[in-house]
Design a protein with these regions (language model features):
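Active-site rim recognition segments
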Residues: 75-78, 142-218
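Hydrophobic/aromatic-rich core segments of domains that either
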Residues: 63, 105-175
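Helix N-cap and loop-to-helix transition residues
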Residues: 39, 53, 88, 177, ...
Length: 335
């Protein structure tokens, strides 16, 4: 908490020296009708109608987010990650408040609607060799020239003063080259460094990027494409494997890894419960089919059926029971 206050206060003294790069979009974005402020889709449609160039569209979206969302200091440590992304964005639009994840998801939602490949990056930050006390979230966009750039709408939205958020726009973290972003932002997953030779945590903490080029080149674009095709559970497992591969030394990285393991445990449990429910439904189906045979037998096998049809009335439920038994055995203990 003290770190964030210090960081944002530090930024406050540099704001006056920053040119207003938003001058070519702010007047237009301030004129957006109230009817188009209620969803990311409507905001994106407005931007698309007013701007055609890539840089202008992204800048307009960024400006809208940082100028319309204020840092919610009262809920800094109480982010509800259970709600869906759509619900989180809707609440951010309605309340005009949020912490880093709200800024990031709101910005991502708009630029995604505009057709850009935007990813949310989670990690931790530092300023003047002081590491933040809590993790952080920002964005990265793959531009049409296939180059990745980083964006941090939270840090560009204002600063804290005397326990209150002061709205003061900046552009220091707008469209930053990945290697520059790494001076202050360290992703938990090295994939999001967008470097051929990813740096280590130790390099980040010391501020000295060695980038061992004797290593094999890391094809991050291919890895990202494969990663995005995975299910959420598989993505978490993918992240876990990369964190194990590189090691995780910092306090926040260790905390993220512990949360990651718990998330995977929950996914595993939920998957087992779903499988158990499916097995139960299939077993009941077998019971119903077998009861049909019992009723038919009690009716003295009337009306008449061919032998192969009668055998099928027995073999089908028995096959279901056998399959259920095998699935239960593979499932093991649940709960």
């Amino acid at each position: 908490m003290k770190y964030i206050i210090y960081l944002l206060l530090f930024q406050a003294f540099t704001f006056a020296q920053v040119n207003n790069i938003y001058s070519d979009v702010e007047k237009t974005m301030q004129s957006i009708p109230e009817s188009q402020k209620k969803s990311s889709k409507e905001i994106a449609l407005f931007i698309k109608d007013k701007f055609s160039l890539e840089d202008m569209q992204i800048k307009a979206a960024y400006y809208y987010v940082i100028s319309n969302v204020s840092y919610d200091i009262t809920h800094e440590f109480t982010v509800n990650l259970v709600i869906s992304d759509d619900e989180m964005v809707s609440k951010t639009i309605a309340s005009k408040k949020g912490v880093c994840i709200h800024y990031a998801k709101f910005f991502k939602d708009i630029v995604t609607q505009l057709g850009y490949n935007c990813q949310i990056v989670s990690g931790y930050t530092k300023k003047d060799n002081v590491v933040a006390e809590q993790s952080h979230a920002w964005c990265a966009i793959k531009m049409k020239d296939n180059k990745w750039f980083a964006f941090d709408p939270t840090w560009d939205s204002g600063f804290l003063q005397n326990g209150k958020f002061v709205k003061k726009l900046n552009s220091k973290y707008f469209k930053i080259k990945p290697i520059e972003m790494l001076k202050s932002h360290m992703p938990f997953d090295y994939m999001w460094q967008f470097l051929d030779y990813p740096i280590t945590e130790q390099e980040f903490l010391k501020g000295k990027f060695i980038q061992d080029k004797n290593q094999e080149i890391f094809d991050y674009d291919t890895v990202i494409k494969k990663h995005n095709l995975l299910s959420e559970n598989e993505q978490l497992s993918d992240l876990k494997n990369r964190m194990i591969q590189t090691g995780y030394k910092s306090k926040l990285a260790k905390e993220r890894f512990d949360i990651l393991k718990k998330q995977l445990d929950v996914y595993s449990l939920n998957s087992s419960i779903k499988e158990l429910n499916d097995i139960n439904a299939k077993y009941n189906e077998g019971i119903n089919l077998f009861n049909e045979f019992i009723y038919y037998r009690n009716a003295q096998f009337r009306p008449e059926k061919e032998d192969k049809e009668i055998l099928k009335m027995i073999s089908t439920p028995l096959a279901i029971f056998e399959d259920c038994n095998d699935r239960i055995y593979k499932l093991g203990f649940v709960g």
